[in-house]
Regions:
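Bacterial Sec-dependent N-terminal signal peptides
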Residues: 1-22
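Intrinsically disordered, low-complexity terminal tails and linkers in eukaryotic proteins, enriched
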Residues: 20-60, 64, 85-154
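Mature extracytoplasmic domains of secretory-pathway proteins
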Residues: 69-71, 75-88
Length: 154
């Protein structure tokens, strides 16, 4: 009985360490400002309002080490029920840059695209809107970004 109890305790401890490591890895590679994702924009609003909407600090939750703000309690609850449905692709970095050369480039949270139920964010400053470039070669850039993003975790 002691052996089983020890094995169970070890398994629980191991899972806890793995979860902590995953959270630390996400924090290292996600596009965060002071631990905050999407520059404080509500990830659910992109899907339900089809626009970027600033979230509120009082409606914040943390998911696997990443802090998200929400514009409404309804959006917060939707995220809690299915966080991976609403999290941005490529850790919230510019999808175009990830596909073009595998680089982490900041984004304009109001420049986005929903594609196959996933949120893609883009750089849009100084006369450069990378969403336009993405749209010209979306299939290739998405394929490349899907290959490049996991490489950053190695």
């Amino acid at each position: 009985m002691k052996v089983i109890s020890c094995l169970m305790a070890f398994c629980i401890f191991s899972l806890s360490v793995v979860a902590q490591d995953a959270g630390a890895l996400r924090k290292k590679h996600f596009n965060l400002e002071n631990g905050l994702a999407i520059k404080g924009y509500d990830p659910v609003a992109y899907f339900v309002q089809n626009k970027g909407v600033k979230g509120k600090k009082e409606l914040a939750i943390s998911h696997q080490g990443i802090l998200y703000y929400f514009s409404s309690e309804t959006n917060k609850e939707a995220f809690k029920a299915a966080p991976f449905k609403y999290e941005p692709e490529y850790g919230g970095w510019c999808a175009y840059a990830m596909g073009q050369n595998g680089e982490k480039v900041t984004i304009d949270p109001e420049t986005f695209k929903i594609l196959n139920g996933r949120l893609y964010l883009f750089y849009n400053r100084y006369f450069t809107n990378t969403l336009k470039d993405w749209n010209k070669n979306e299939a290739t850039l998405k394929k490349n970004a899907d290959i490049n993003w996991p490489k950053l975790f190695k």
